[in-house]
Amino acid sequence: MASVKEGDYQALKEEIKKIMKQPGYDDGSAGPVLVRLAWHASGNFSLVEHNGGSNGAGMRFPPESVDPANAGLHYAISFLLPLQSANSWISHADLWTLAGVTAIEAMGGPQIPWEPGRLDYESEQAAVEHRGDVSNRLPDGALGAAHIRDVFGRMGFSDQEIVALSGAHNLGRCHADRSGFDGPWVVNPTRFSNQYFKLLLPGTRLMMLPTDMALIEDPSFRPWVEKYAADQNLFFKDFANAFGKLIELGVDRDDTGFARLAKKAAEEGKPLDKTAPPAGDETCPVSGAVGGGVQRAAGGGGCPFMAMQNREAKL
């Protein structure tokens, strides 16, 4: 696996696209499972507990690594491991989320907003100390609308965002040994489109979960299913916004753009000490912004790549 220049995320995305070609895996593509990895790494965030989310890459350690909801994601992690080993300057947490957005784009989907700066837990002990218990927070496909709202509401998503994010079921397939369900949702499970919503409405259905059917049975969800089935551009726009929000969950950035120990910072009610932001005459190789001028989705901040030169990207 190729090593790319430190901070060259575009080159890294090209390497991720090469990884997506997996003739021996589902439908010959790792794309859908890379999207699922980014989703599950982020989707255990809680606004109440102030923990979980994409920061830390906690799925490398128990109990997240053995959570039944994450069954099969070891394939995605193993596909990315050679690339991470060849480019140790990027954290697992950043690579997992970057791989997810890259896969969506490569499979014909929208461009998802993404920023670097996530850190990795160095050990299981560090993950447990800073992340806490994030089990039983991911959607259960066998349940209905109330469960969906509970899961997504915990992360701060609206009904519209819930339906948009559910459109990720246009990709990949279920496996009986992982979820108890089997088969793809759509005809072409490696191409991102609005076909999932079209198939949800009366017509031919390949395979739908109870959580999928809840989207057309619930009076608040269904109008969005109908809108996205009729307008792929609208779906792409709303999905990009919702997925970009999803992968930022738990990423409490400091003024250098790096993620803080979100739970500890919340408990103490103050930010943690960080290395000073880079000098104002330096240009960020990620965004092209100068010095601390780049603005981030989770708050203002400087360039995380340049700050990385002055600190170790580990929790």
UniProtKB/Swiss-Prot annotation:
GO molecular function: heme binding; metal ion binding; peroxidase activity
Top-rank taxon, per record: Eukaryota
Claim: Lipid biosynthesis is one of the keywords in the record: no
Signal peptide per UniProt: none
Keyword field contains Oxidoreductase: yes
Entry's Gene Ontology BP terms: cellular response to oxidative stress; hydrogen peroxide catabolic process; response to reactive oxygen species
Top-tier EC class: oxidoreductase
EC number(s) per entry: 1.11.1.-
Binding-site list for heme b: H169
Catalytic residue positions: H40, W185
SUPFAM superfamilies referenced in this protein's UniProt entry, alphabetically: Heme-dependent peroxidases
Residues the UniProt record annotates as site (Transition state stabilizer): R36
Stated role: Destroys radicals which are normally produced within the cells and which are toxic to biological systems.
Name under which the protein is recorded: Putative heme-binding peroxidase
Organism in which the protein naturally occurs: Cryptococcus neoformans var. neoformans serotype D (strain B-3501A) (Filobasidiella neoformans)
